[in-house]
Amino acid sequence: MNSRRTFLAASGVTALSAQRAVGANDRVRIGIIGPGARGQEILKEALSIPGVELAMATDIYTARLQEVQAISPGVKTAMDYRRLLDEKDIDAVLIATPQHLHCEHFVASLDAGKHVYQEKTMAFTVDHAKRMRVAFQKHPKQKVQIGHQSCSFGMAKDAAEFVAGDKLGKVTMINANMFRNTPTGKPQWSRPVKPDMNPENVLWKSFLGEAPNRDFDANRYINWRFFWDYSGGNVYENMCHQLSFWYKTMKLQIPQAVTMRGGIYLWKDGREVPDTMNVTMEHPEELLFSWNSGFGNDHLGATEAVLGTHGTVYKDGRGVRLLPQKVNNPSYTEQTGASTAPRNAHMLNFIDAIRKDEAINCPFDVGFRVSIACRMAVDSYRTGKTLRWDAKKEEVTS
């Protein structure tokens, strides 16, 4: 996309210096639902953009509201997110709540007339995805950005150029990895239960949402990523990012069949989600997307390889490269992408969409397709079956 942001990155002009002169009409007042660890990160990205003001923050845990005061002293706060949606002068809402609550907060925010930045994974279930789509279609003038930040990376532009035309020939597979390691005795995602995490300081019923009712459990609250009632595990935390990048770049549809296998091989700490896994997704484009992930070794890191008869596009943390298949393209030479983007490019794109109707980098449709693929993977693992997508009925079958 030949956007203002791409021009700035290519010309070496920073987003900050380019936007210093912000008029009153460019002011964007935001609210945030869920300023936890990730929520505070995206909030800081938003506030780094001139003319963006935090009007209100809401969270079901009192300590989070105290933490947000350190970011924006004096900001209005509440534990009930509906108080935020009642504020008529709030233009946009950042949603960074646990995954099982996304649908509730997304639909309510759009119905309240707000633009929405929705953290990933967009939808927790197929039903949630459909309900969110109804709300999205009902409010076509409101901007929705799904929080797959890699869609705004500089390498997104390079990857789109590398896969365009017939450079890769027939693409039959994408092989992706996401591996991490942590010091012995420090399990991935594990967070300590603090003394103030009690029913007086946490709105437990609001946390549960549509999840099964149960008595207050501070561990389930703070370590919600461990439990299927609230989380899709690593599939929803990391596979979604790698899917979204290529689902957008290559316009891939929802997979017609998904198989996930794995287990809890490392940490027997009460978690329900696996720490080691393999997902195979068969797409209607005659393309197999394979994703391997684990938390016990970081040698393979986070990488993706798009495999075509004429070439390979290889992506890692350093950038993206086009590698020729000499057997079919003996004259081709390796190409390395050089496009860059500011750290807050995804949030900047969202704000520019509100201000100037700029195209959204990760639109709702990408989030929808990714959400369905992720849910199919999780349910395949939990049932031990290969699951299939009926595109006409929009239903998952086995």
Regions found by a protein language model. Name each.
Residues M1-G12:
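N-terminal secretory signal peptides and thylakoid transit peptides that target proteins
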Residues A10-S72, S150-F153, V163, W246:
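N-terminal Rossmann-like dinucleotide-binding module
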Residues V68-V75, A135-Q137:
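Short, conserved SAM-binding/catalytic segment
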Residues K76-D80:
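Conserved SAM-binding strand-loop segment of SAM-dependent methyltransferases
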Residues V93-L94:
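N-terminal Rossmann-like NAD(P) cofactor-binding module of classical short-chain dehydrogenase/reductase
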Residues P98, C103-S152, D166, G384:
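Beta-strand-loop-alpha-helix segment that lines the small-molecule cofactor/substrate pocket
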Residues K157-D158, K170, N175-L323, N328-D365, ...:
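Contiguous beta-strand/loop segments that form the cofactor/metal-binding neighborhood of enzyme cores
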